């Protein structure tokens, strides 16, 4: 079964991973989709994107939900509809190539999974302080640059406001890849917000989860 792993980043945050090793047709037969989702699926040109989309729905079903429980707000941010008048869990979604991932929590969270690719070094100066990867081997530079992108992307998913700039507004503290956690700040609109970050390597991917630090 392509369910890959469940990760407890804290007692409040659980991440679920699905490895998209099945064919698109096999996945499609296994999930129940509302008409809106089916139309969206058909509009996707890439089979990889279609499989990732279905992988997320497989994870929802693994967690006791269905596609019918998932909605998106006007900005495209996902949320789970409440069940039996309960306060719904917060959800964050990410996917990259082989993997689909969701995070469920009772508090605001942002999740990102990224494939480790050398080309990240070409764009890294656009979104990060390159001093963070000085004096590292090339392999470590690539891994850390991908991690920092994931940190910024995860925080952006929580805040999700127009005008936020990765290099100008989101700042991560110095960390080592072996730490698997760090802290970061969003400095935007004359406010400073602190975030805790957890990250880990999954095969040749980096998984990052952000949540507010109180």
Where are these regions (language model features)?
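Core catalytic alpha/beta fold that binds nucleotide/phospho-ligands
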Residues: 1-214
């Amino acid at each position: 079964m392509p369910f890959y792993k469940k990760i407890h980043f804290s007692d409040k945050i659980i991440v679920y991973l699905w490895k998209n090793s099945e064919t698109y047709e096999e996945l499609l037969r296994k999930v129940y989709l509302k008409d809106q989702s089916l139309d969206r699926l058909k509009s996707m040109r890439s089979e990889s994107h279609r499989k990732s989309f279905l992988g997320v729905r497989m994870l929802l079903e693994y967690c006791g939900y269905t596609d019918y429980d998932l909605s998106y707000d006007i900005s495209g941010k996902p949320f789970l509809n409440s069940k039996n008048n309960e306060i719904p869990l917060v959800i964050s979604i990410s996917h990259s190539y082989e993997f689909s991932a969701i995070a469920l929590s009772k508090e605001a969270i942002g999740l990102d999974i990224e494939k480790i690719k050398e080309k990240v070094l070409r764009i890294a100066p656009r979104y990060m302080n390159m001093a963070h990867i000085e004096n590292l081997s090339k392999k470590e530079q690539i891994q850390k640059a991908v991690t920092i992108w994931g940190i910024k992307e995860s925080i952006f998913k929580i805040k999700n406001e127009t005008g936020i700039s990765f290099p100008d507004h989101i700042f991560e503290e110095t960390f080592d890849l072996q730490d698997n956690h760090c802290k970061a700040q969003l400095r935007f609109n004359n406010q400073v917000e602190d975030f805790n970050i957890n990250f880990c390597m999954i095969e040749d991917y980096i998984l990052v989860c952000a949540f507010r630090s109180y």
